[in-house]
Design a protein with these regions (language model features):
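Feature captures hydrophobic
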Residues: 1-113
């Protein structure tokens, strides 16, 4: 497992803990299924499936179709996961981009905050 993959795995663990303790978030995600790609613009990227509040099939490589795609360099993702780069600053400076519906963007904000 490379360094970025480890950071993403830790973020998934935090997400699972957040879901376990937040009943409102569980209810909000109960009927949601999304394919998610983490596109490292300088590498092959990662993917997972958000399925009714659970993250499944986290792996290296991108899914052929995804409702949510996050784009950044490997370094910027590492800085985001270590807290050295704040998500809103990364987005405002276009170091973090995403392809997703507005509803999904708002859900992502809840999950990473």
């Amino acid at each position: 497992m490379d360094e970025l993959q480890g950071h993403i795995a830790k973020a998934i663990d935090k997400f699972r803990a957040k879901i376990a303790e937040d009943e409102n978030l569980r209810k909000e995600l109960a009927d949601i299924t999304r394919n998610v790609n983490v596109d490292t613009t300088d590498n092959e990227g990662f993917s997972f499936i958000l399925d009714k509040g659970e993250i499944k099939d986290f792996k290296k490589g991108k899914l052929p179709t995804a409702e949510i795609t996050l784009h950044a360099t490997t370094l910027d993702f590492k800085l985001l996961f270590t807290g050295e780069l704040k998500p809103m600053k990364a987005w405002a400076t276009k170091r973090l981009k995403f392809d997703a519906s507005l509803d999904d963007v708002m859900r992502l904000k809840k999950l990473i905050s």
